[in-house]
Structure formats: C-alpha cells, structure tokens
C-alpha cells in the first residue's frame, strides 16, 4: 500500500512511470499489486496526471512568454530592473572577440569597458535569442570591429557597433536580415557613398585617436547607409567634422568618456552596434525606454523607407540641434540620428537610456558641418529603386527595429522621406509651427531644421506626399515625457517620429512590442488586452461605429416587422380580404346539417308555439300537485321516515373551534363507532331486502 502512493506522489516521475511502479513494486508481486490498486489508480491517477499536464502547459507558455519578452527587452533595461546580471567579463574582452561580447545568451551585448558599469546581466536570458539572430550579422560586425582595432578598446568596440548601422537606423532584432540587405545595398551604393566617406574621413581627423577607426567606420556606415537614402550618409560626413559626425564617430566619443556606460543592446538586433545606436538614441529621447527610437534603421536598408531613417534620426536631435536645423541642408537628413552639429551636448547615440550620462558627451563631438551639401540627386536616385523594391520588407523590419517605440503606427509615404527632405531643403518655405508634443506622430523631423521641417510638411501637402500624423496615445508616453532628461530634450515632442504607415497586422505587433519596454514589472497581458490598451482615438471611433452598425444589423428586417404589425392596405385590399374570410365561413356553415336533416334524424323536434305553451303548463301542474301531496314533518316522523329530534343544538362561537388540534373537535373512537352504527342501521332499515342480500346494505363496517 505504501509504495504505490509514495511513487505516485513523487513529482519527478512521469505519469507512465508512476503506473509502472505502482503495478510492479519491489515489495509485492506485480499481479497482486495490479489487482490490489487498480481501483486506487483509477481514483488518484487522473488527478495526478491532470496536475502534471497543467504544469507542462504552464511551462510551455512561460517559455514562450519568456522567449517573447527576452526578444523584446533590451538587455540594458533588463539589467536595470535586476532581471539580468551584468557579465563582469564583458568589459575586459578585447575588440578581437566581438562576436562573444555581441552574443551573450543570444543577446547582442555592446562591447566596451564603459558597459561593464551598467547593471548586472543575468546569464539566464533565454539562449533562444541566439538562434533568432543570424550568424551573418555577427561576422559582419567582427569584420567591422576588426577594422577599428587601432582605437582604444572601448572606442574601437563602441565604434564598430555603431558603424554597422548608421545612426538613423537603430536596428532592432530584425537587424540580421536588414543588415545583410544593407550590406548588399552598400556594395551598390559604394560609388555614390565614396564622397561621403571621403568627407567623413577628413572631418574625422579632428579626433586623432579615432581617425583610423572613424574612416573605416565611415566606410562601413556609408555601406550600410547607402541602402537608405544617400543624403543621410552625406550628412554624416559633415557631422563628422567634430570627430563624431557619423553615428560611428558619435559612438567613438562616448568610448572616450568612460562615465557613460553604453547601453547593452539586448535587442534582437544581431548587430550590437545597431542595438547600441538605437539604445543611445533612446537614452536621449526616452529615458524609460532602452529600446531604440523609431529612427529608421539602416539595417532596414531599402526596407527602412527614408522617412523612417530621417524620422528616427530626428528623434535623437536635441533642442540645440533644432536651432541649427536651418543650417543643415543635406546633413540634416543623416544628422537626424547624429545629433546635428550643435554646441549643446547632443544625445550620444552610444549612451545608455539613463539621462544623467547623456550630458557627458561634449557637444563638440556631435557638431555637424552643414556647409557640406551633397547633390540630392547623387545617392538618392540610385537608392530609391532599391528602397522601393525593399519596401515590401519594410513592415517586418520596421516592426522589429521600432519595437521599443511607444508611438509607432504611421504610413509608408509614396515618396521616400529623404527625397522629400531634399526637396524641402532645396525649396525655402516659411516655417510652419511645429505641433505640440501631444501630437505623438508628428516627427521631430519637422522640428529639427526650421526650413527643413516646414518644407517637408508643406511639400507633403503641395505635392501630395502624404505624411500622415496620427495621435497615438500609449500608456508609457506620459511617463516617458515626465522622465525625459531636460538637458537632453527641451521639447515634449521627443518621443514623436514620422514613420511610414504599416499594415494593420504589423501595427498591432509593434504595439505589442512597444508594450514590452514599459517600466515596471513585466506583466503578461493577453493579446486582446494589449490591443485594447493601445487603441487610438481613431480606433475607438471606428469601434463605436462598428458597434452601431452591429446594432443596426440586429434590427428586425421589414418582412419580420410586417409579421408583427398590420400593414397599411388600401380599401380594395381590405374588401378582398373580407370577401375571402366570408367565403371560408360560408363554406363552413354550408357543411352544417339543415333543420330538416336534424328532424329526420330525431335530433331536432318539430314544434310550434302552441305546443310549447301546452308543455309548460303541464309541467307546472304536475309540480304543484306533487307539492300539495308532500307529507308534513309530523307525518314523516310518524312514519319513521324522519328519525331526528326536532330541536336545534346551538353552541357559542368560542366553544365551537374548527381547528384540528382542539380535543373537542376530534371524534373519539367511541363517537366514530356510534356514527357507524347509526348509519348502518339506517341503511339496513331504509329498504326492505332479502336476507341473503342484507349484508350488502351495510354502509360501514361495524
């Protein structure tokens, strides 16, 4: 008896094992055990099995949720929350081993000594992420990192990561694919990008330590950038005049300043560099959100419509950048990611989301020289076809890369944004007032450069290049606005960006992803709940209309209403109906037998009035005679027909109680016997009967 239960209680054993052990224990013979506990097994095993099944399901679901969350959460944020422990070895790794640093537990972790200071990362991060990331991006990163080996470890590491993706496109997890695409495009655009590289390299000279790395980085940046509108790559060069014009350069600068630990990209970006870029941008824009800002990723090469890239870049611009908006013509497009040359400290793309760290970057590093303007036609036209080809892929990549952004859904503009920006720069137009921060979808793009912003928006109107601005209210937005470091951004519009509109399904995915970046404990929400929480005002309006339509659909149809109400008919119709009813009634009445038939069948007696009166008179006479012949009471008593006494017994009301519980209302057995006897005597004497039939006259048994 003891063994089977003990075995059944052991959680480690599988249900099948439990059965086997129950049946074949060491102590008793298997056959005996089987017969003995077959009933017990029926009672307990289903419960045990059910319990184990539920736990298996729970494990599976928890694994899936963990996988999703780990894919969504930037490592730096997880470290902040204490979910992950920071790897102490990371800081010590030399640039030669970028691949290891990039993929810790499948997460691309930025390489750099500065990062070691960031919160501890847990090795428990699901290894599944590693499978998600593709090996190709890692190899690319290694190559790029290797090129920067001359720089100090921190610089070299930070720069390579930044380099692969131009600052405009902080890539998200899809980066692996987007990265490959960007490389392929980079080859195509290398010719066009050559000018940008040259400019970047020249400007880089200001930073002696990072010059070699910067040049190589600039090249890589151009390669990755070329897929995206050329203008950005070109602006990057101007920006590099202060040694960090290109995104890669900006990252290099942070390396010099150890106090700012670069955020650890826990993003799905296989490219740590891209992850870093995105995180650095986020750190400036959204302190709460480590995930990269909407800035389009270069990783989305062609996929990232120029609008994405420029918008993303814009989000990172600081107020000082906006002052210089007018000065940057071409540079402004690339600069959006690179903080435009601004005396005030631009948002270091390399910097982790924490606001305090952003200030350390010298404003100088991000100054961009606007004078260098590249003909808009140069790379733009070459890259436009590629981008349009890849627009198909945009939705997915955008989702992945923008996953951290709370305010995402927007439309894919018919014309690439970089072209629009180019047009806006070329055609000076009055500056339109920027929308308030409440307009979530209004991009910083429109606020980064005055002429730039107005031009782009007005061009959208005049040339029917729709930049649709949607107000997307996400729960995290208000928190982010409150937490945004004042030094990094003076305007509320920080979290806003213009993004190509995505298909509805992609939008929902993005919203789910952005939800993962919210501060606080990770809450597992149902998909329905998430959708509801992110419904915009427009969605609510549509929903209201839908519900109204549903209610209207539920209204009874006209034929149904006619069934329950008298339809309005003309007089002729009424007469026709009346005639039909009359015909049916006549037909029914015609089926009744006639009086003649009834008389023949003796059912109806033929009578006239005289006969009836005579009948009545006869009845009356007969009755009166009977009454006159009625015997009196005395006669009846004398003839013993009436046997009761001629007195009436009267009782007081209080004495007469019909309630059954009173003793005087109950007949005693003697009373009952007397009643039976009297009745029997009356019945027997009521009528003369033969002796043999006498027993039939008994009314009650005595």
Curated annotation (Swiss-Prot):
It is found in: Cytoplasm; Cell projection, Lamellipodium. The modification Phosphothreonine is found at residues 358, 432. GO terms for cellular component: cytoplasm; lamellipodium. Coiled coil: none annotated. Residues 106-120, 147-156, 301-318 have a biased composition (Polar residues). Keywords: Actin-binding, Cell projection, Cytoplasm, Developmental protein, Neurogenesis, Phosphoprotein, Repeat. Signal peptide: none annotated. Pfam families: RPEL (PF02755). Transmembrane segments: none annotated. Residues 1-38, 82-194, 222-363, 473-536, 592-615 are annotated as: Disordered. Its main location: cytoplasm. Residues 508-518 have a biased composition (Acidic residues). Residues 163-173, 342-362 have a biased composition (Pro residues). RPEL repeats lie at residues 63-88, 583-608, 621-646. Residues 233-250, 486-497 have a biased composition (Low complexity). Belongs to the phosphatase and actin regulator family. This is Phosphatase and actin regulator 4. The lineage of its organism: Eukaryota, Metazoa, Chordata, Craniata, Vertebrata. The gene is PHACTR4.
């Amino acid at each position: 008896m003891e063994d089977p239960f003990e075995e059944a209680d052991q959680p480690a054993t599988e249900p099948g094992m439990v059965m086997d052990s129950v049946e074949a224990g060491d102590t008793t013979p298997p056959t005996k055990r089987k017969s003995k506990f077959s009933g017990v097994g029926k009672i307990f095993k289903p419960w045990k099995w059910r319990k184990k099944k539920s736990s298996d399901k729970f494990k599976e679901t928890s694994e899936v949720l963990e996988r999703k969350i780990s894919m969504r959460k930037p490592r730096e944020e997880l470290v902040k929350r204490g979910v992950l422990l920071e790897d102490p070895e990371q800081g010590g790794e030399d640039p030669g081993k970028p691949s290891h640093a990039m993929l810790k537990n499948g997460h691309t972790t930025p390489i750099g000594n500065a990062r070691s200071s960031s919160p501890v990362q847990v090795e428990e991060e699901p290894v599944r992420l590693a499978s998600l990331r593709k090996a190709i991006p890692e190899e690319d990163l290694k190559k790029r990192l290797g090129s920067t080996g001359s720089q100090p470890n921190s610089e070299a590491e930070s720069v390579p990561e930044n380099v692969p993706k131009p600052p405009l496109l902080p890539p998200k997890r899809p980066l692996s694919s987007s990265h490959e695409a960007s490389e392929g495009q980079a080859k195509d655009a290398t010719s066009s990008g050559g000018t940008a590289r040259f400019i970047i390299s020249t400007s880089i000279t200001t930073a002696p330590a990072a010059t070699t790395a910067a040049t190589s980085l600039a090249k890589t940046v151009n390669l990755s950038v070329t897929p995206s509108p050329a203008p950005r790559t070109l602006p990057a060069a101007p920006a590099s005049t202060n040694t960090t014009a290109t995104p890669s350069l900006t990252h290099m600068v942070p390396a010099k300043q150890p106090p700012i630990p670069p955020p650890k990209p826990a993003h799905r970006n296989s490219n740590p560099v891209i992850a870093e870029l995105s995180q650095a941008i986020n750190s400036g824009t959204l302190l709460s959100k480590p995930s990269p800002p909407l800035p389009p990723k270069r990783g989305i090469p062609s996929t990232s419509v120029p609008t994405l890239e420029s918008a993303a870049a814009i989000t990172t611009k600081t107020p000082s950048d906006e002052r210089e908006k007018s000065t940057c013509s071409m540079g402004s497009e690339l600069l959006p990611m690179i903080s435009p040359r601004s005396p005030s400290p631009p948002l270091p793309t390399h910097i982790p989301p924490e606001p305090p760290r952003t200030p350390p970057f010298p404003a100088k590093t991000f100054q961009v020289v606007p004078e260098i303007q590249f003909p808009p036609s140069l790379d733009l036209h070459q890259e436009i076809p590629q981008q349009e080809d890849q627009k198909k892929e945009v939705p997915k990549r955008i989702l992945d890369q923008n996953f951290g952004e709370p305010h995402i859904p927007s439309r894919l503009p018919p014309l690439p944004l970089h072209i629009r920006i180019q047009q806006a720069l070329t055609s000076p137009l009055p500056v339109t007032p920027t929308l308030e921060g409440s307009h979530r979808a209004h991009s910083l793009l429109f606020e980064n450069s005055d002429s730039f912003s107005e031009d782009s928006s007005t061009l959208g109107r005049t040339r029917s290049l729709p930049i649709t601005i949607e107000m997307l209210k996400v729960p995290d937005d208000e928190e982010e606005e409150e937490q945004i470091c004042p030094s990094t951004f003076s305007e509320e519009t920080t979290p806003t960006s213009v993004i190509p509109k995505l298909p509805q399904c992609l939008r929902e995915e993005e919203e789910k992803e952005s939800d993962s970046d919210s501060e606080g404990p990770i809450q597992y929400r149902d998909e329905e709940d998430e959708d509801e929480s992110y419904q915009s005002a427009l969605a609510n309006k549509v929903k209201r209309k839908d519900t109204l339509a549903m209610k209207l659909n539920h209204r009874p149809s006209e034929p149904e209403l006619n069934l329950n109400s008298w339809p309005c008919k003309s007089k002729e119709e009424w007469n026709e109906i009346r005639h039909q009813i009359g015909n049916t009634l006549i037909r029914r009445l015609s089926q009744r037998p006639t009086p003649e038939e009834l008389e023949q069948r003796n059912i109806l007696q033929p009578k006239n009035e005289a006969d009836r009166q005579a009948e009545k008179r006869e009845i009356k006479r007969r009755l009166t005679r009977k009454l006159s012949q009625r015997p009196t009471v005395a006669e009846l008593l004398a003839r013993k027909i009436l046997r009761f006494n001629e007195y009436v017994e009267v009782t007081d009301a209080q004495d007469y109680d019909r309630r059954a519980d009173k003793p005087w209302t109950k007949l005693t057995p003697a009373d009952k016997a007397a009643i039976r006897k009297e009745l029997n005597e009356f019945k027997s004497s009521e009528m003369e009967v033969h002796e043999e039939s006498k027993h039939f006259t008994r009314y009650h048994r005595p």
